[in-house]
A protein has these predicted regions:
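Beta-loop-alpha module in the N-terminal Rossmann-like domain of NAD(P)-dependent dehydrogenases
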Residues: 1-48
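C-terminal helix-rich "cap/oligomerization" subdomain common to oxidoreductases
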Residues: 1-6, 225-297
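Short glycine-rich anion-binding loops that position phosphate/pyrophosphate groups of nucleotides
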Residues: 7-9, 59, 144-145
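Well-ordered, non-membrane alpha-helical segments in soluble/globular domains
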Residues: 17, 65-73, 99, 231-240
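Short, well-ordered coil/turn segments that N-cap beta-strands
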Residues: 27, 52-53, 135
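A contiguous active-site-proximal alpha/beta segment in oxidoreductase catalytic domains
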Residues: 36-105
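Rossmann-like dinucleotide-binding domain that binds NAD(P)(H)
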Residues: 84-168, 173-179, 186-188, 287-294
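C-terminal glycine/acidic-rich active-site capping loop/insertion
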Residues: 171-253, 279
Length: 297
């Protein structure tokens, strides 16, 4: 098995050529996203011909934060038997591929079921609507992309929220935190006999404000050394579990038709958003929240 992190042709790299070379030797390939649909079709066909596997890895759905956001979205639905009534994704051009993958997995949606429309062409964020048979979601997409340094200059990498009347589930960043915030709703709050200081606390007042499912690492170095490799190990373990299964028996996200449809949705989203503004974000001053500013005299 070869893991390829060299960029694919659509972002100016030779990753797909490397993938082809390995597949031609009968070596299965896991290739880093994004990959153009035409390349995926070609490489999937080659993998089938050579009796091996070709999989695109979007990484972020497989790290701890992504997995817990996906898992708890599905747990909430199972408990209350209701789809989210609202949602929002904020991300950048470089990371929209993985954001769409996280969303589809959490909602158990096939990418073919999603349509994309442009609501407002703004700067620095554009507003698009992702529609599916169960509802709509607002996508806030960064308009700038640095062609010379695409992996940097994201105003937001991943910020994803799904909301229900009972509260909302947040993936605050690519590596967390993942939190559930309870909605404020107190029964009989207009009854003075049941006011907070007139009677024992109600069940609603005893509820915690939020529940934390995952706290992110302390530093970007911890992410690079631990969290990202763990995400890749997780995906490889999932692949190993279904290595001998026919494609239609594998988990949906590892099936060729899902992987191709996700890339097609990615292209459709970028086409709807229109051409990015090529450039970098101005240098910024890093925040230091641990340094004491002292008291005023």
């Amino acid at each position: 098995l070869a893991c390829i992190v060299v960029r694919s042709a659509i972002v100016g790299g030779e990753g797909s050529q490397l993938a082809q070379a390995f597949l031609q030797r009968g070596i299965s390939v896991v290739q880093e996203h994004p990959v153009h649909p035409d390349e995926i079709t070609r490489l999937q066909s080659l993998a089938e011909k050579m009796h091996c596997h070709y999989i695109v890895n979007s990484l972020y759905p497989h790290n701890k934060a992504g997995r817990l956001w996906i898992e708890n979205t599905q747990k909430i639905y199972q408990q209350i038997q209701q789809r989210p009534v609202w949602g929002q994704i904020i991300t950048s051009r470089q990371l929209i591929y993985s954001a769409l993958d996280i969303y589809c997995q959490a909602m158990k949606l096939h990418p073919n079921d999603i349509t994309v429309t442009l609501e407002k062409d703004n700067t620095p964020l554009q507003f698009l609507r992702l529609s599916n048979p169960t509802g709509d979601l607002l996508l806030c997409l960064q308009k700038h992309l640095s062609s010379n340094d695409p992996d940097q200059h994201s105003l937001v990498m991943h910020h994803m929220i799904l909301g229900w009347p009972a509260g909302y589930l947040t993936l605050a960043g690519s590596y967390g935190p993942v939190e559930w915030n309870n909605a404020l709703y107190i029964h009989h709050h207009q009854d003075s006999k049941k006011a907070m200081y007139q009677s024992p606390a109600t069940m609603e007042l005893d509820e915690p404000l939020f529940h934390s499912f995952h706290t992110p690492p302390n530093s970007w170095q911890d992410v690079m050394e631990c969290e990202a490799p763990e995400a890749i190990n997780y995906l490889l373990a999932e692949i190993d579990k279904c290595w001998q299964l026919p494609n239609d028996k594998k988990p949906m996200i590892l099936q060729p038709h899902y992987q191709l449809a996700l890339s097609q949705l990615w292209i459709k989203t970028l086409q709807t958003a229109g051409k990015a503004i090529d450039g970098t974000i101005a240098p910024f001053k890093r925040m230091n929240f641990t340094k004491s500013s002292g008291r005023r005299k």
